[in-house]
Amino acid sequence: MDQLMNFSLTSPIFLLLSSLFLIILLNKLMRGNKIQKGKKLPPGPKKIAIIGNLPSNGRFTSLIVFLNNLAEKYGPIMHLRIGQLSAVIISSAEKAKEILNTHGVRVADRPQTTVAKIMLYNSLGVTFAPYGDYLKQLRQIYAMELLSPKTVKSFWTIMDDELSTMITSIKSEVGQPMILHDKMMTYLYAMLCRATVGSVCNGRETLIMAAKETSALSASIRIEDLFPSVKILPVISGLKSKLTNLLKELDIVLEDIISAREKKLLSQPQQPLMLDEEDMLGVLLKYKNGKGNDTKFRVTNNDIKAIVFELILAGTLSSAAIVEWCMSELMKNPELLKKAQDEVRQVLKGKKTISGSDVGKLEYVKMVVKESVRLHPPAPLLFPRECREEFEIDGMTIPKKSWVIINYWAIGRDPKIWPNADKFEPERFSNNNIDFYGSNFELIPFGAGRRVCPGILFGTTNVELLLAAFLFHFDWELPGGMKPEELDMNELFGAGCIRENPLCLIPSISTVVEGN
C-alpha cells in the first residue's frame, strides 16, 4: 500500500496529468472572466497569459521596466489582467493622491493572500486585516500606544544596548571585508524581539527563522493568488503544507511566550514592570484582559500572535535594505560620504558612542535617508489595495475586487517632479518640508491614506540610528582596491528593493572618534 501511494503521488504520469488538468482549468477560468459591457476600464494591454509577458527572471529592473514601458504607452492609470486578477497600476503622484485620498475608503481593503491568511492567523495583523472597526481600533492602538512617539522613545535603551553589541562585533573584524546586511539583521532581530516580547525569549531563533521563511515566500506574486477560486492550487504547489508546518513551529513559541508572561503577571500582580516588560506584548495583554484604554475592545491570543509576528516581520528586511542603499550611495559618492560623516562627528563631538536620542539632531543624515528611499524604495510597488466597491476616475471604471497598485518606483524617479531624477542628491530636501509620512505624494515609500504604515517613526529611527552609527564609529573602504565608480548598483525585486549583490565593505575604527 505504501509503495502504491508513493507511486501515485510522485510518478511522472501523475505529475503530467496533474499539470495538464491545471493548465486546462486555469485557461478556462481566464476565458470565463468577462468584462461587463458598457464599462470603460483604464487602458492596458490584452489579457496576460499565465506566464505571459511578465518578466520571469526575477530581476527587479525587468519588472519595473516592463511596467514603466506600459505606463508610457497607456498612461498613469493602467489596467492589467493576469489570470483571474484585475489590477490597476497607478504611476503618478497626482493620480495616487486622487485614488488614496478622494477614493480612500473605496480602496481601503487588502487582497487576502495565501501567505497572509495562514501566517497571520487569517490576516489579523494591521497590514492585511480587512477594513472595518477591528482595523480602525487596531491602528489607534498602534498610534497611541504600540508605536507612539513616547513608546519609540522608551525603546532607546534597547536600541542603544543592541547597537553596542553590533558595534563591538564590527570592531572585532576591522580590516576584513564584511557583509553589512548580516550585521544589521542581527541587530534588528535582537532589538525587535526585545521590543515586542521582552528580553526573555527562549524561542527567538524560531521567530527569526519563521520571519525569514515568510519573507522569502512573500517575495513575488504567487500563482496561488492569481487564481483565488482554484482552492486546490496551494495544495498542489506545496505552499499550504509549507506554511502550515511553519506556522505550527511559530505558534508553539508565541503561545509559550504569552503563557509565560501571563503567569508572571498573575503571580506578581502588584510588582512594577521591569523595563523589557513594558513592551508591545504587555500592551496587547491589557487589551486581552479588558484593561486597555478602550475597555470595550478585546483581543484574542491569535490577534496578539499575528500582531507580534507582523511587527518582527515588517521591521527587519526593509530597514536593513534602506541602510544598505544609503551606504551604497555614499560609497559611490565619496564627497557625500564625507559630508555625512562630518555632520555626525561634529554633532556628537566629545561622545564615545551614539544613542537613539541623538538622531533627531542629524539633519543631513535624514536627507540621505529620504533620497535613498526615493531612489530605492523598500516597496517599489506599494502593498496592493483591494477595491471594496466599483467607482470611476477620469471616466474610467475601477472594478470591485480589483487590485490597486501604486508604482512608487515610477513616482520616485519621475523627472516632472524630481530634477536629475536618477542622480543621488540628498540636498534636494534641504529647502523644503517634504517628508515620507503620507501627506507628500511625491515621497510615499511607506504608503499613504488609510493604510499608511503605522510604524514609520519606529522604522526610520532605527534606520537613522544604524546609518549614523556606521558613519560615526568607522571609516569605510571598498574591497580589492575597487573604485567608487566601479561599485555596482543593481537592484533585485524580491520582498522589497534589495541589492542584487550584498554590499561588502572593509571597516576601520575612526581615529577621530577614538581620540575624543
UniProtKB/Swiss-Prot annotation:
Query: Where's it mainly located?
Result: endoplasmic reticulum
Task: Return one Gene Ontology term, BP aspect.
Answer: terpenoid indole alkaloid biosynthetic process
What GO terms are given for molecular function? heme binding; iron ion binding; oxidoreductase activity, acting on paired donors, with incorporation or reduction of molecular oxygen, reduced flavin or flavoprotein as one donor, and incorporation of one atom of oxygen
Q: What is the effect of changing S220A?
A: Acquires the capacity to convert geissoschizine to polyneuridine aldehyde; no effect on activity towards tetrahydroalstonine
Protein origin, superkingdom = Eukaryota
Entry's localization field = Endoplasmic reticulum membrane
Pathway, per UniProt? Answer: Alkaloid biosynthesis
Would I find Membrane among this entry's keywords? yes
| EC number(s) stated in the UniProt entry for this protein | 1.14.14.-
Annotated InterPro entries: CYP450_71D, Cyt_P450, Cyt_P450_CS, Cyt_P450_E_grp-I, Cyt_P450_sf
**Which EC class is this protein assigned?**
oxidoreductase
Q: Which residues bind heme?
A: C453
Q: What do the Gene Ontology cellular component annotations say?
A: endoplasmic reticulum membrane
Q: According to its record, how does it sit in the membrane?
A: Single-pass type II membrane protein
Keyword annotations of the record? Endoplasmic reticulum, Heme, Iron, Membrane, Metal-binding, Monooxygenase, Oxidoreductase, Transmembrane, Transmembrane helix
Q: In which tissues is it expressed?
A: Highly expressed in stems. Expressed at low levels in roots.
Q: Where are the transmembrane segments?
A: 6-26
Read off the Pfam families from this record. Answer: p450
What cofactor does this one take? Answer: heme
User: Which reaction equation describes what this protein catalyses?
Assistant: tetrahydroalstonine + A + reduced [NADPH--hemoprotein reductase] + O2 = alstonine + AH2 + oxidized [NADPH--hemoprotein reductase] + 2 H2O + H(+); ajmalicine + A + reduced [NADPH--hemoprotein reductase] + O2 = serpentine + AH2 + oxidized [NADPH--hemoprotein reductase] + 2 H2O + H(+)
Q: Which PANTHER family does its entry note?
A: CYTOCHROME P450 71AV8-LIKE, OS08G0105600 PROTEIN
Q: Which family does it belong to?
A: Belongs to the cytochrome P450 family.
What is the annotated role of this protein in its UniProt record?
Involved in monoterpene indole alkaloids (MIAs) biosynthesis. Converts by aromatization the tetrahydro-beta-carboline alkaloids tetrahydroalstonine and ajmalicine to the corresponding beta-carboline alkaloids alstonine and serpentine, respectively.
Name-wise, this protein is Alstonine synthase
Gene assigned in the entry: CYP71AY1
